[in-house]
Amino acid sequence: MAVKVITDSTSCIPKDLAEKYGVEIVSLSVIMNGESYKEVDIDSEAFYDELAKCDKLPTSSQPPMDEFYNAFEKFAKDGHDIVAAFISSKLSGTYTTSHIIKDMILEKYPDVKIDLIDSQTSVMALGIGVLEGAKAAQEGKDFNEVSKIVRNTIEESEIIFVPGTLENLKKGGRIGGAAALFGKMLKINPILTVKEGAVVVMDKVRTKKRAIDKIVEVVKQDLKEKGIKQAVVCHILAEDEAKDLAKRLKEELDLDSMIGEISAVIGVHVGVKSVGIAYARES
């Protein structure tokens, strides 16, 4: 039987690519003003307009257990093995819950092989690894090969971005209030990345232009030292800036990139006008 790949909605894989490569996506939800919104159904402009009116930062919730279980069972019942990669366990409980689902599935379908992966990252740094694995599965690679490709690609993945605001990071406890106020007063633009599963500050610069320059510099270094096999410019309602960055990467580095939106679960923390890049180095 074939190998199937499952991930969650924070991977930011576009619907057309998920369908093309047979990726099953389970959706996290964002809870705002007492209402729950499935991430895959969110209209970005309406969502962030509403977010701007909130005093309290929205929270996120894992996929419902029945939907989570059904995503696995639809493959297991046909005898397919499963490789599943999820958002960092330090950012969500989704990966932890997937172990409960795995145990339930194996009790009913003991011959199915399931590999669960804590990506230690999110957004398209996760999505790129999932897509590489799904492509390999479609090419007929076996369970161990697909698992290795997903793991290795994620391990070589990077996400670097400039948040649109420090306020949401402060509200969510990602940075301290004093740090947020200090950054706002001095117009400091932090450059963020994900290390060991958590969002951390890579660098701090005085303007967003310098932040973008720094991102290009980091990408250029990785391209020179290891090569880059896939890149996605990510943004939140900053399509023009994203296109400018993608154009710059092509003109200066001859690096092609897709353009995609940052997931709402992550977006509530980093805010509108966030822009950055996710990419996977050659392994």
Swiss-Prot record:
Hexadecanoate binds at S60, S92. Keywords: Lipid-binding. The keyword NAD does not apply. Pfam families: DegV (PF02645). InterPro entries: DegV, DegV_C, DegV_domain_contain. Gene3D superfamilies: 3.30.1180.10, 3.40.50.10170. GO terms for molecular function: lipid binding. Transmembrane segments: none annotated. May bind long-chain fatty acids, such as palmitate, and may play a role in lipid transport or fatty acid metabolism. PANTHER family: DEGV DOMAIN-CONTAINING PROTEIN DR_1986-RELATED, FATTY ACID-BINDING PROTEIN TM_1468. This is DegV domain-containing protein CPE0304. The lineage of its organism: Bacteria, Bacillati, Bacillota, Clostridia, Eubacteriales.
